[in-house]
């Protein structure tokens, strides 16, 4: 699909079909109104069975110095992900990307994890759920460790719900610290095919209340039981 026509032709429903084929849209910048499809030769994934948490971060999660919720402030999270951050002045999240993923959220296929401190949004992440796969789109923080806490809570929810694939699209140094790896496209597609079979439960951990850090850590610790 050409860059000039992609933006107008993509719908939330088409976007889901694209994810099932292993592709996703991006924009060059927040000011570029057009979108283009991406299918990396090397795909970033976080193997849930070997997800690791640095000990300092585990203490932060357990301390509940942050309050973590799900799907209570989706628009605010995607706006936070689109905003400039230290070391990241440009963003690929343009207006059309916002519209599409808000549409997916309204269909129940896109979720946010919000991290709060003193009733202010300190960080979070959002991504797409399809079958037993979760596709992480973006994360942000305005308070140290907030996005990392969001990721720990996301992984706990995925493990508790029977998910088998956490797709990060690309791998950063930040994600490598949690065990993220790159795999070839063919291997990724094989994992995706398996993940699209069956269903997982994003609500295996409570959706209607904040989840304590100890509960999230226990879900991760119990993954092999």
Swiss-Prot record:
Tell me the compartments it is located in: Cytoplasm
Gene3D superfamilies linked to this entry: Leucyl/phenylalanyl-tRNA-protein transferase, C-terminal domain, Leucyl/phenylalanyl-tRNA-protein transferase, N-terminal domain
- Does the record bear Ion transport in its keywords? no
Entry keyword set: Acyltransferase, Cytoplasm, Transferase
Annotated GO biological processes are: protein catabolic process
What is a single cellular component term in the Gene Ontology annotation?
A: cytoplasm
Q: Which Pfam families match?
A: Leu_Phe_trans
Q: Which reaction does it catalyse?
A: N-terminal L-lysyl-[protein] + L-leucyl-tRNA(Leu) = N-terminal L-leucyl-L-lysyl-[protein] + tRNA(Leu) + H(+); N-terminal L-arginyl-[protein] + L-leucyl-tRNA(Leu) = N-terminal L-leucyl-L-arginyl-[protein] + tRNA(Leu) + H(+); L-phenylalanyl-tRNA(Phe) + an N-terminal L-alpha-aminoacyl-[protein] = an N-terminal L-phenylalanyl-L-alpha-aminoacyl-[protein] + tRNA(Phe)
Q: What is its EC number?
A: 2.3.2.6
First-listed, main subcellular location of the protein, grouped into a coarse class: cytoplasm
The molecular function terms of the Gene Ontology recorded here are: leucyl-tRNA--protein transferase activity
Q: Which domain of life is it from?
A: Bacteria
Signal peptide residues on this chain, from the entry's feature table: none
Role description: Functions in the N-end rule pathway of protein degradation where it conjugates Leu, Phe and, less efficiently, Met from aminoacyl-tRNAs to the N-termini of proteins containing an N-terminal arginine or lysine.
Q: Which family does it belong to?
A: Belongs to the L/F-transferase family.
Q: What is this protein called?
A: Leucyl/phenylalanyl-tRNA--protein transferase
Q: Which gene encodes it?
A: aat
């Amino acid at each position: 699909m050409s860059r000039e026509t992609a933006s107008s032709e993509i719908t939330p429903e088409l976007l889901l079909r694209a994810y099932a084929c292993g592709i996703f849209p991006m924009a060059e910048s927040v000011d570029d109104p057009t979108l283009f499809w991406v299918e990396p030769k090397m795909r970033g994934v976080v193997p849930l069975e070997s997800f690791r948490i640095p000990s300092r971060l585990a203490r932060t999660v357990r301390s509940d110095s942050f309050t973590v919720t799900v799907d209570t402030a989706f628009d605010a999270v995607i706006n936070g992900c689109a905003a400039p951050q230290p070391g990241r002045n440009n963003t690929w999240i343009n207006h059309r990307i916002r519209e599409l993923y808000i549409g997916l959220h309204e269909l129940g296929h896109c979720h946010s994890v919000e991290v709060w401190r003193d009733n202010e949004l300190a960080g979070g992440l959002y991504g797409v759920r399809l079958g037993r796969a979760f596709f992480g789109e973006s994360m942000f923080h305005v308070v140290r460790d907030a996005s990392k806490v969001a990721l720990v809570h996301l992984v706990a929810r995925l493990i508790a719900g029977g998910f088998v694939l956490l797709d990060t699209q690309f791998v950063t140094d930040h994600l490598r610290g949690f065990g993220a790896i790159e795999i070839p496209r063919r291997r990724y597609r094989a994992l995706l095919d398996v993940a699209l079979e069956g269903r997982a439960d994003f609500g295996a951990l409570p959706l209607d209340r904040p989840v304590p850090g100890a509960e999230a850590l226990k879900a991760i610790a119990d993954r092999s039981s």
